[in-house]
C-alpha cells in the first residue's frame, strides 16, 4: 500500500512538471529529443486516442540499430512482466497528430500549428518526442540517436504503420532524405526467351529455317576436302531452298546417299529412294547436287524443269547452256522458243563432249550417238563453227590498175566475206547501183545504166548450178562487158575477176559488200551513183544444214 502511494505521488509530480503554463493560449511548439532510447508510455485517460495503458510509467530497453527490429511484431516485455505496446497501438499513438510529422518540424523553419491540444500530448516516435511544452534538453542528442530515430521513422513508412494520408506525408520526407539501406520491393521484369545461336530450327537432319524468308534450306557438310587457310576440314554444300520442310529433308537424304552411300543416317527410310539411287549412279556429286538445286522451289528465276535450260528475263525465250566444257565455265548453245528444243540442244552438246556417260534430259536412245560424236558441230548443225578455210572474215579485195592494163580510171574496193558452198566454189552477194535521176526505161532506174545493145543478159546464180535454167528466186540481171558502160570508166568483167572459176560459165560476180567505194571523176550522167547494199541477204540463213546457198532477193520484180 505504501508502495502504491509512492508511485502515485511520483507520477503526479512528473505530470505537473510536464503541464503547460496556459493550456488555452496559443504558442509555438518546439522539438525536443529524449535523453535515452526508452519508450515512454502514457495513460490513456490523458489522451483518448491511446488504446491500451493502465498507468503512466516508462521502461528502459536497449537501443535497436536495425530497421525492422524496432518495429517487430513480437511485443516488448516490460520490466514488471506486462506486455508492451503492439504495432497497432503504435499506429493509434501516431494518429494523435492529424497532420502527421512534417519536415518543417524537424528543421524548425516552418510555422507551427495553433491548435489547442490536451494537457498531455507527448508522443514517442523512435526516440523523437513531440510535445507542446517540455523542458529544454539537458544535453544535445548524439548523432547516433538522431540517425536511429530517422531510420525508425522511415522503416515505419515501409511497414505501413502510418494510416491514411499520414503514410503519404512520411513518404515525402523519405524522398527528401534518401536512405541507402532502403529495400526495393519492385519485382524484377521477366526476361524474354531469346533463341540462342546454333539452335535447331527443324526436326529434320540437315534442314534449317531461314530467319527472314521463312523457307527451309537443306545443307550438307562435305568433309572430303579442305580449303587453304581453313581450320575445319570440309565445306558446306547448299542443296536448295524449299517451301516444305519434308522436301528439304528429302533433298538432304538424297545428297547424303550420293556422298556417303546407303549406310548413312537419313531422315526417311532408304526404301523411299530406290528410283533416285539408280539415277544418281550415272552422275557425279556436283551434277547430282546441281539437279537437286534445280528441283528446289528456291531456284533462280526463270528455271526450267530441264537440265541446262533457263528462261531469259527480258524476251522470255529459252536458252540452252552447258557448263565446264572445253575449258570454259559456261558455253552458250542458243535460244529456242520451247523448253524441249533447248533441252535437246543441251543433250546433243552433252553427248558430244561427255560421250555415253552424259546426263541428258531425254533418253539417250533417241539420239544417234555415233553421228553426234563424229560431227564437228556441237548441236547438230544449229551452231556451225567456221573452218580454217572459211575463217577469213572481213577479207579485202582490192582491184588496182596493176591487175589489168585496161583498168586505168576506176578503183573499186570491196570488203566482203568469202563463204564456200558445198561444191567448193566461192559465191558473192551482189550490190545494185541505182541512179537517182528519173529515166524513161524501167531497167535504167533499177540498174543505173542506159540501154546498150552490146550488153548481154546473163543469169546471176551460184557456181555449179544450171545457168540456162535458173531456179525461182534467182535474179536475171544484165552484165556489162569491159569498156561498154557510160560511166567513163571500166568495171571488172568475169574474165578479170573470177580467175578460179570455170571458163564455160562466164558469170559475173559483183560482190555485195557492207563497205563499197568507187572513185570516178568522169561520169556520163553528170550525177552521183548510189550503191544500195542488200543487208537482208547477208543475214538470211537456210534452216537446212546441207543448203548453204544464200539467195539474193531483188525488189521490184513481179
From Swiss-Prot:
<feature type="region of interest" description="Disordered">
    <location>
        <begin position="1"/>
        <end position="65"/>
    </location>
</feature>
<dbReference type="GO" id="GO:0010311">
    <property type="term" value="P:lateral root formation"/>
</dbReference>
<protein>
    <recommendedName>
        <fullName>AP2-like ethylene-responsive transcription factor AIL5</fullName>
    </recommendedName>
</protein>
<keyword id="KW-0805">Transcription regulation</keyword>
<dbReference type="GO" id="GO:0005634">
    <property type="term" value="C:nucleus"/>
</dbReference>
<dbReference type="GO" id="GO:0048364">
    <property type="term" value="P:root development"/>
</dbReference>
<keyword id="KW-0936">Ethylene signaling pathway</keyword>
<feature type="DNA-binding region" description="AP2/ERF 2">
    <location>
        <begin position="305"/>
        <end position="363"/>
    </location>
</feature>
<dbReference type="InterPro" id="IPR016177">
    <property type="entry name" value="DNA-bd_dom_sf"/>
</dbReference>
<dbReference type="GO" id="GO:0009873">
    <property type="term" value="P:ethylene-activated signaling pathway"/>
</dbReference>
<dbReference type="GO" id="GO:0000976">
    <property type="term" value="F:transcription cis-regulatory region binding"/>
</dbReference>
<dbReference type="GO" id="GO:0009791">
    <property type="term" value="P:post-embryonic development"/>
</dbReference>
<feature type="region of interest" description="Disordered">
    <location>
        <begin position="74"/>
        <end position="93"/>
    </location>
</feature>
<dbReference type="GO" id="GO:1990110">
    <property type="term" value="P:callus formation"/>
</dbReference>
<feature type="region of interest" description="Disordered">
    <location>
        <begin position="166"/>
        <end position="195"/>
    </location>
</feature>
<dbReference type="InterPro" id="IPR036955">
    <property type="entry name" value="AP2/ERF_dom_sf"/>
</dbReference>
<dbReference type="InterPro" id="IPR001471">
    <property type="entry name" value="AP2/ERF_dom"/>
</dbReference>
<dbReference type="Pfam" id="PF00847">
    <property type="entry name" value="AP2"/>
</dbReference>
<comment type="function">
    <text>Probably acts as a transcriptional activator. Binds to the GCC-box pathogenesis-related promoter element. May be involved in the regulation of gene expression by stress factors and by components of stress signal transduction pathways. Involved in the regulation of floral organs size.</text>
</comment>
<dbReference type="GO" id="GO:0009845">
    <property type="term" value="P:seed germination"/>
</dbReference>
<dbReference type="GO" id="GO:0060772">
    <property type="term" value="P:leaf phyllotactic patterning"/>
</dbReference>
<keyword id="KW-0539">Nucleus</keyword>
<dbReference type="GO" id="GO:0040019">
    <property type="term" value="P:positive regulation of embryonic development"/>
</dbReference>
<comment type="similarity">
    <text>Belongs to the AP2/ERF transcription factor family. AP2 subfamily.</text>
</comment>
<feature type="DNA-binding region" description="AP2/ERF 1">
    <location>
        <begin position="203"/>
        <end position="269"/>
    </location>
</feature>
<keyword id="KW-0804">Transcription</keyword>
<keyword id="KW-0238">DNA-binding</keyword>
<feature type="region of interest" description="Disordered">
    <location>
        <begin position="387"/>
        <end position="406"/>
    </location>
</feature>
<dbReference type="GO" id="GO:0060771">
    <property type="term" value="P:phyllotactic patterning"/>
</dbReference>
<keyword id="KW-0010">Activator</keyword>
<keyword id="KW-0677">Repeat</keyword>
<dbReference type="GO" id="GO:0003700">
    <property type="term" value="F:DNA-binding transcription factor activity"/>
</dbReference>
<feature type="compositionally biased region" description="Low complexity">
    <location>
        <begin position="1"/>
        <end position="54"/>
    </location>
</feature>
